[in-house]
Structure formats: C-alpha cells, structure tokens
Amino acid sequence: DTEFTTQVPTGNGPDLIVMAHDKLGALVANGVVAPVDLGEAKSNFADVAVKAVTYNGQTYGVPYAVESVALVRNNALTKDTPTTYDDMIASGKTTGVQYPFIIQMGDKGDPYHFYGFQTSFGAPVFNTNADGEYTSELAMGGSGGTDFATWLKAQGDAGVISPSITGDIAKQAFLDGKAAYTVTGPWNVAAFREAGLDVSVLPIPSAGSQAAQPFVGVQMFYQSAQSTNTLIAKQFFNYLATPDAQEKMQKLGGRASAMPSVADKSDDQDIKDFSKVAESGALAPAIPAMGKVWSFWGTTEANIAKGAEEPEAGWATMVTNINNAIASK
C-alpha cells in the first residue's frame, strides 16, 4: 500500500488495486482512492462487507471475500458444539488429551485471536457512531475490559492460555491430535484437512455474557483517484459486484464470498461455516487510530496471562497508554 500511495499522485499507479479493508482509512486520508457506487448490488453483500468498504459515509470499493477466525473442533475427539467457554473446556477435558483447548498467544500477545472472547465481555476496541462507523474513542475500558482482563488472568493461572504457546505450537498440537478445540482461521483449517483430520468450523463460544464476535477482515478492490480509465473501471466494478464474479473469485481464492448467498451455495462446508461466523463478527477497524492500539494491547494481554501484571491495574494502564498514543498522533 505504501508503493500505491506513492505512485498514485504521480499518475503512474495502477487503475485498480486489491487490498484488505483495514487500509481504507489511510488510503482515503492520503487522497489516493476514489469513491465507488455499489448501486443495487449493495443489498447482496453482507452488512459487515458493506461497512468494510464505507468510510465517512462513502463507499470506496467492491468487497469480494470475508475472513475471520472461528472455533475449530477435532471431530475424532468430540462432537460437542459448546456455546460457552466453560462448556468447551469441560467438553475438551472429557477427551483426555493434553489440551482441552489451545489458542496461540506468543510473548507479544495476540489480541486478534482473543478478540471474540473479549467482545463477549462487552469490551469492543472502539465505540461506534450512529452510522455504525468506528470512532477513535476506546471502548475497552470500564467494567467490560476489567472483566476480560480478570478472565485472562484466571485462564493463565489455570494453564489454559500462555505466552509460551505460539501460532506454530498451537497448530502442531492440534495437528498431532493433542487438542480438542482451537481458535484459528481458514489458513490452518486447510492444513488440518490436508493432514487428514476430520474437523468442523463452529462459532466461538462466549466467555462472558454477550455473543463472541471475532474480528472480520474484508478483501476489496479499490479504484485509484487518478485513474484515466474510469469508464472501463466502472464496468469492471459492476461485474465484480455480480454473483457470477463473486462465485468465480470464491472458487479461485478459497475464501468465503462477501455475498452470503454465494457462500451458502458453495460445496465447501468450511467456506459456508466461516461465512456464517464472519456475518456475525465485528469488522476490524480501518481507522488510523487502530495502528496505535496493537502493541500496548498485545503486551498487556500476555503480561496479565503470565502474572506479570495485575488484571485491573494493568488493563487501566494499557487504556491510558493507548489514549495518549492516539492523542499524540
């Protein structure tokens, strides 16, 4: 995206580019992408996909794929479909394997993989305005954030989560049949299937009292603000917004379409299941303030899980640090 942002003002950049939606805020701020009207096709896309291509009330591209993490179950070990975190742990323990549930964290933390659990405590990363768009006002403070931090500490004390569990360790443990459940995305599910595992993709169970909403990423086509082929670009965008084009991209890319009706017709059960999880997920913020969040957020989660910081005080310090970073720009 840096190269695109540099090239567009000179007139040398491409007419179209494909990137994740979380680049949208920066691209609009730099004036390098043009609005794109989805027209009547707008209603065919998942709400989360439409939100993804919308910034300050304008749509800026055509979404084509949605992606999120989900709960993945080893069907050889259990056929339970837990709706709460505690039920999942209890179910996993009955299998007798080393890990009732495993999730990657690493020494820098992993807010992305843990976000579904965090939202179940009513602690989304940012507040939203009346139109449902994110503001730069943090929503992770208050009782919801404290409750999530306290839960993190309890799971760390219980040995369920740990900064010592990296992505590779979690993946290998699941591949080796040492874990009943994990939270991961389609990239690892493909590897599980290639290894011959029988798995199912399920909604993430709630650890708190609300629904678990993992982050949803959306892949989209953008149009350069300096494009000289606007008529051809419009025709191409109109085609990309048809079910036919969406179905072809889904087959080629192996990712759930941004159109639920297209994903529902797939003969790939994983695509169908990930699509359903994404539909009820939370769009990953595309606002510039998001760049100030990750480092403090992840480090604090890891420290709380391993007992290096007290939950309430550590979380409050994190919120203060993030707010200061956002204010300093």
Residue ranges and their predicted role:
Residues 1-25, 39-42, 172:
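Early extracytoplasmic/lumenal segment of secretory-pathway proteins
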Residues 6-7, 14-15, 42-73, 211-212, ...:
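A structural signal for short loop-to-beta-strand junctions that line the ligand-binding cleft
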Residues 60-64, 69, 88-137, 144, ...:
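Extracytoplasmic/periplasmic solute-binding protein
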Residues 132-164:
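Glycine-centered hinge/linker elements that transmit conformational signals in sensory
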Residues 198-221:
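Periplasmic-binding protein-like
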Residues 280-329:
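Conserved C-terminal helix/tail region of periplasmic/extracytoplasmic solute-binding proteins
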